[in-house]
Amino acid sequence: MMRIAVASEGLDVSNHFGCCTNFNYYKVIDNQLVDSRNLPSHGHLCGSQANFLRQIEVRVLLCGTISQNDIESMNKAGITVVSGASGNALQAVEEYLQGNAEQLVVHN
């Protein structure tokens, strides 16, 4: 099982990780979405988002843009950051899972 979080504003990917208001959270088994939730963002203090996402066992974070400091915090928490996502969060996850998102950049 894999857990993916999308830094979001409502149901859409947030333009910048630091400005996200919530996370759309997806559980994936055998490349199939089996559960989704909308979770509030827990502030943007140094490392707080990484700790929160680690606690809910997220392994991949999809986002629009993200600072190098946030990438490093996520990577230290064992979370792979994938930037360059946009549009609807669910569609971004589906494209990521299908390998159809050429605009995405993986940071790990």
Question: In which residue ranges do the predicted regions lie?
Answer:
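N-terminal first-folded block
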Residues: M2-S41
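Short secondary-structure boundary segments
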Residues: S8, G64-T65, A85-S86
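Short connector loops at helix/strand junctions that flank enzyme active sites
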Residues: G18-C20, I56, K76
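Compact, glycine-rich, soluble single-domain proteins
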Residues: S36-I56, V60
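Amphipathic alpha-helical interaction surfaces in cytosolic regulatory modules
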Residues: A50-R54, V60, G64-N75
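C-terminal structural segments of small proteins and small subunits
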Residues: Q68-N108
